[in-house]
């Protein structure tokens, strides 16, 4: 994997920085593990915008990724590493000994030909998936389940990981990348190591058009709008917002907590916020 600063042949390429991985598969993805997905452009079933700044972009196939890793005791060989347009991490196509192929999130250091295993008897090696009760305390993990059998939901993006801090009864404590410490049932599964493509955050897209390829539309500032459109809008000429930053609906925009899921609050041992 290499970081390439593009030659400034145009204003759009002057600031562009790419992450190039020559180990990625250059051909088409595995067709049996593809699914079609239609773009909603941020609209709901009534056609109204529910998520702003979405629309357009290149059409993509969804790669069906195995987040459960339940084929216990069956060794799998990594056939190839692939780019996935739906996530920041790369994915790996693995071939199980029984002939089945599946996509998984590619951990850091994974190579073509490497053997992987899942289940309680799997060795503690990067890419192997085990129940948390079988993972030593202090191990770096990723792709962590929040409920047993539901599939990995935490620590899935490029370069992320978590650390197993302790086990107490039927729960374990896991420190996430944000600093949050969370309780997870020991029967939940996690994968050893950290997610690969850790240099993803160093890329510079260079031009607005690259965001349009990704289906991201422009974000208009509130102070550039009219009062009917935004609390920051209006005024003669260029003016400041005149109040603390808020969303178009008046919700504080800087540091205001919006989490409302009280049902799982008891699973959070330490919040990620400093205050």
Curated annotation (Swiss-Prot):
Residues 35-49 have a biased composition (Polar residues). Residues 35-59, 224-275 are annotated as: Disordered. Gene3D superfamilies: 2.30.30.30, Nucleic acid-binding proteins (2.40.50.140), Ribosomal protein L2, domain 3 (4.10.950.10). Transmembrane segments: none annotated. GO terms for molecular function: rRNA binding; structural constituent of ribosome; transferase activity. GO terms for cellular component: large ribosomal subunit. Residues 50-59 have a biased composition (Basic residues). It holds the Pfam family Ribosomal_L2. It comes from the Bacteria. The keyword Lyase does not apply. Keywords: Ribonucleoprotein, Ribosomal protein, RNA-binding, rRNA-binding. GO terms for biological process: cytoplasmic translation. Part of the 50S ribosomal subunit. Forms a bridge to the 30S subunit in the 70S ribosome. NCBIfam families: rplB_bact (TIGR01171). PANTHER family: LARGE RIBOSOMAL SUBUNIT PROTEIN UL2M (PTHR13691:SF5), RIBOSOMAL PROTEIN L2 (PTHR13691). Belongs to the universal ribosomal protein uL2 family. One of the primary rRNA binding proteins. Required for association of the 30S and 50S subunits to form the 70S ribosome, for tRNA binding and peptide bond formation. It has been suggested to have peptidyltransferase activity; this is somewhat controversial. Makes several contacts with the 16S rRNA in the 70S ribosome. This is Large ribosomal subunit protein uL2. It comes from Burkholderia orbicola (strain MC0-3). The gene is rplB.
